[in-house]
A protein has these predicted regions:
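Fold-level signal for large, globular catalytic cores of enzyme and receptor domains
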Residues: 243-245, 260-296
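Active-site recognition of the HExxH zinc-binding catalytic motif
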Residues: 302-319
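Active-site rim elements
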Residues: 135, 291-302
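Compositionally biased low-complexity segments, especially N-terminal hydrophobic helices
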Residues: 159, 190-193, 357-370
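Beta-strand-enriched, solvent-exposed domains that form extended recognition/catalytic surfaces
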Residues: 2-110, 434-511
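Propeptide-to-catalytic entry region of secreted or membrane-anchored zinc metalloproteases
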Residues: 42, 53-254, 259-262, 272, ...
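Eukaryotic short linear interaction motifs
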Residues: 121-125, 224-226, 264-265, 323-325, ...
Length: 511
């Protein structure tokens, strides 16, 4: 491919968001978003060449109608390597751009460990076949959690926080539960969360790992598609009803998921793009659909990996928001990786306030007291009439500007300050935080400077109001209207974040 296009005499520049010359990248999958300026009617593709470890990776990617492009590269190698130099060359029409940066895998004392949960089998399967399936599923989990790690970094960088993402503790490990497959399939997701959390805490391998959080997938998830087909009810609720040993639930130190949607997930890096764009229709008589009614493999992949981002956010102490990853937006993960997709108008997810979600915690870390609270989730779908024209326009602009998949400002502040996401954090001895609510003065006081205060609804952890404290202060006085919700109606609780990453939930009846 030549650097110029025959017939085009314009001078073009290639612009790249976030990645800058001499930058340091700390996550192994690198997502690059950019554009050709000004637009070129002749150029259809951009050529990208990444030089790393004396080898070249080349990609040709399509430009969108607005001359935008996205690229995804795999930088992975031994996690113990020193910083490696990388060189990225981009060419399109007359535009050329060269960026030199370094890749240094993240190091932090606070990590996330992937687990593949195996329950006790009543009937023994062939050992070799079972072990092979476990290896394949662990590899699939590893790849897709690396993508989640990349997306967290990409979206937090877009919010102004560089190198903020979680550190993986290593590859996915098989975890043997004390629960049988029959018991798991007879349990609801709240009970599964409690049982598996207890198993992890009681295990010799993981029980004393206070600086680990876990992302776990249940191996024996089963879908009764025949019953769904017989009922002719293909609603989200009915499909979910016929999933056994399934969960999508996060909080404290554990984010727990089923494995029934792995059919739509990529097993290898080269398959990621094809999986996210896969328009194959889901045969609901055989496979469960979880795509927010898109009914495609790509929709299932987007919604279920988006759900991993959402539930993992709860493990990082995030509440619910109306929009973005922690609200209605996690279905739109496909838009993070693609360009020129049509505007999507999906049914709204509503908070399931009846769900008594898991209240146990898998971490004994005193700084995460708020993460053990019950968190109802955006699990139900509300089918609505065609949106009004102004709503359609709002949707278009939202999806055009930030993919509809983003962390709202308050969530980004929490994540940027959180110990599990701050870069290169050692197991340092920090001043123990003492955070209190003083009813007499309607104040929140702390011995560590306050960074953010949120007021969240008791029923669904939806953030009603937040206050970002940019100046170092040890006191925050709640406005009268917020104090009324907290102390008089007692319909809300306060979530508090300090500058050293301590978090605490405060209510009027708590000390």
């Amino acid at each position: 491919m030549s650097s110029g296009i025959k017939g085009c005499k314009r001078v073009h520049q290639i612009e790249v968001e976030q990645l800058a010359d001499a930058a340091e990248v700390q996550h192994s999958l690198l997502l690059i978003k950019g554009r050709l300026q000004p637009n070129c009617a002749s150029a259809k593709q951009l050529k990208a060449t990444l030089t790393l470890r004396e080898t070249e990776q080349e990609q040709l990617t399509q430009l969108s109608s607005g001359s935008e492009f996205k690229l995804l590269f795999d930088l992975a190698a031994d996690e113990d390597i020193a910083a490696e130099r990388c060189r990225l060359q981009l060419r399109c029409c007359s535009g050329e751009l060269t960026l030199c940066f370094s890749y240094q895998p993240r190091r932090s004392a606070y990590r996330v460990q992937p687990l593949y949960i195996v329950c006790q089998q009543e009937q023994q399967t062939e050992l070799e076949t079972e072990q092979q399936q476990q290896l394949e599923r662990c590899a699939l989990i590893d790849l897709n959690l690396r993508l989640v790690q990349c997306i967290y970094a990409h979206k937090l960088a877009a919010a102004g926080y560089e190198n903020r993402t979680f550190t993986l503790n290593g590859g996915c490990q098989v975890f043997q539960s004390t629960l049988s497959c029959a018991e798991a399939r007879a349990s609801g997701e709240d009970e599964l969360w409690q049982r598996f959390a207890s198993d992890i805490l009681a295990s010799d391998a993981w029980g004393q790992q206070l600086h680990l959080k876990f992302v776990a997938f249940i191996g024996c998830t089963r879908y009764d598609g025949a019953s769904v087909a017989a009922s002719a009810d293909y609603s989200y609720a009915n499909i979910r009803k016929h999933l056994q040993a399934h969960a999508a639930l996060g909080g404290g130190g554990l984010a727990l998921f089923g494995s029934a949607h792995f059919y739509a997930w990529p097993q290898r890096f080269a398959q990621i793009g094809d999986c996210i764009r896969n328009t194959t229709r889901v045969d609901v008589a055989r496979l469960p659909d979880e795509s927010n009614y898109r009914r495609t493999y790509g929709g299932v992949y987007a919604s279920t990996l988006g759900a991993v981002c959402h539930e993992l956010g709860h493990c990082f102490d995030l509440g619910h928001t109306l929009d973005g990853v922690m609200g209605q937006g996690f279905d739109f993960l496909n838009r993070v990786l693609t360009v020129d997709q049509p505007t999507e108008h999906l049914p709204q997810r509503i908070v399931d306030i009846a769900s008594a979600t898991a209240t146990a915690t898998v971490t004994a870390t005193a700084t995460s007291s708020s993460s053990a609270v019950a968190r109802p989730r955006f699990t139900k779908l509300k089918l609505h009439k065609q949106a009004a024209s102004n709503q359609l326009l709002d949707n278009y602009h939202a999806q055009r500007l930030h993919d509809s998949f983003y962390f709202t400002h308050n969530c980004a502040v929490i994540l940027a300050q959180h110990r599990w996401l701050r870069p290169n954090l050692s197991e340092e001895k920090l001043l123990p935080a003492v955070i209190e609510l003083l009813p007499d003065s309607t104040e929140i006081v702390s011995n560590v400077p306050l960074r953010l205060v949120e007021l969240r609804c008791n029923l669904n952890s939806l953030v009603a109001h937040y206050e970002e404290l940019k100046r170092e202060t040890l006191r925050y006085q709640l406005p009268a209207a917020l104090w009324h919700l907290l102390a008089v109606e007692r319909s809300h609780y306060a979530f508090v974040l300090t500058t050293q990453g301590d978090t605490k939930r405060l209510a009027c009846d708590s000390s």
